[in-house]
């Protein structure tokens, strides 16, 4: 999965917008692209190093996902109770990555719509 294909997938979900809200904090060292639904984040990643994504996750599914996939672990700068990171190009198939992103989108959309 490449960065543009992933971005297009995220933007294809209803009501999704994107932004780079953390530029002032990174001081040019990196750029985090964030995807929002209803004004709330559901996915983000470092544009300069598209090797992992961070997404919202149902807390009840986290343990099983982390046990099943080595590429799923602690989030990059997120609450470990609600977020996971997925390291791309490892043991999580692209279809599963898209499914996890869709689940993240639904979790956030349901809460804030």
Model regions: which residues?
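Charge-dense, helix-prone N-terminal extensions
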Residues: 1-113
């Amino acid at each position: 999965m490449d960065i543009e294909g992933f971005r297009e997938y995220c933007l294809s979900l209803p009501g999704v917008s994107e932004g780079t809200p953390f530029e002032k904090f990174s001081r040019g060292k990196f750029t985090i692209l964030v995807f929002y639904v209803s004004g709330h984040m559901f996915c983000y990643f470092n544009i300069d190093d598209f090797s992992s994504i961070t997404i919202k996750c149902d807390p009840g599914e986290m343990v099983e996902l982390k046990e099943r996939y080595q590429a799923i672990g602690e989030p990059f700068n997120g609450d470990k109770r609600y977020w996971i990171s997925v390291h791309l190009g490892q043991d999580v198939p692209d279809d599963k990555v898209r499914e996890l992103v869709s689940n993240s989108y639904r979790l956030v959309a349901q809460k804030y719509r």
